[in-house]
Design a protein with these regions (language model features):
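Hydrophobic/aromatic beta-strand patches that form the interior of the parallel beta-sheet core
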Residues: 26, 48, 126-128
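Active-site helix of classical SDR
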Residues: 106
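NAD(P)-dependent short-chain dehydrogenase/reductase
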Residues: 61-88, 102, 112-182
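Conserved Rossmann-fold NAD(P)-dependent oxidoreductase catalytic core, especially the SDR/UDP-sugar
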Residues: 34-100
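Single conserved hydrophobic/aromatic residue that forms the stacking wall/gate
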Residues: 1-13, 17
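Conserved catalytic-core motifs of eukaryotic protein kinase domains, centered on the activation segment
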Residues: 18-24, 58-62, 139
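Short alpha-helical oligomerization interface
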Residues: 18-31, 99
């Protein structure tokens, strides 16, 4: 049987790296993807690439019409919504053309490399834009692992702190455990 496809998930996991060392982010994300693509091209002909929701435009995300509810913010579906946005959230057709971040730019460039390899070398690939993945091995540090920080705050009876949207804590993010992601990809 053919070997299983490599799972390419090169990423500078810490926000500190993303801000202080663009070279490190570029080497890790883009060069890591290129190395994985070459392996897949020469060895098995397919791969799975885990990208990120950070490829979507920050400007477009900030312009999402929101409705404040008692316990959360929701997409205001009564407003005119841009392409790729619905009451279910953001799809793969949402804006990627405007400002995103150095990290998001390298992951979007990696997606383009994957598409080019598929066209040039008949590589078969799956690109999955993950949101927040949290589980074993994630550390409760200021520069990564916000959910781990929240669990620790709850455990030790400390106040939670929120960033953005007026610090209300009403913003909503999907959280995926690595086991669930693995089951999805299987």
């Amino acid at each position: 049987p053919p070997p299983p496809p490599p799972l390419e998930l090169s990423s500078a996991a810490s926000e500190v790296y993303k801000r202080q060392s663009p070279h490190y982010v570029l080497d890790t994300n883009l060069v890591g993807t290129l190395n994985s693509l070459e392996f897949a091209r020469k060895r098995c002909g397919n791969m799975i690439f885990l990208s990120t929701s950070r490829v979507y435009s920050v400007t477009a995300q900030r312009a999402i019409p929101l409705r404040e509810e008692p316990k959360r913010l929701s997409i205001d579906t009564a407003a005119t919504l841009p392409e790729g946005l619905s009451g279910n959230g953001i799809s793969e057709t949402f804006d990627t053309a405007q400002f995103r971040s150095i990290y998001g730019a390298t992951k979007l460039a990696s997606e383009l490399f994957v598409q080019e390899y598929c066209a040039m070398y008949n590589l078969r690939a799956l690109i999955n834009r993950c949101g927040v993945i949290a589980g074993p091995g994630q550390w409760g540090k200021v520069d990564q692992g916000v959910y781990t920080l929240w669990v620790a705050a709850h455990y030790f009876g400390q106040q939670l702190s929120y960033t953005g949207f007026g610090g209300t804590g009403k913003q909503v993010r999907d959280l995926m455990h690595p086991d669930d992601l693995f089951a999805l990809l299987e």
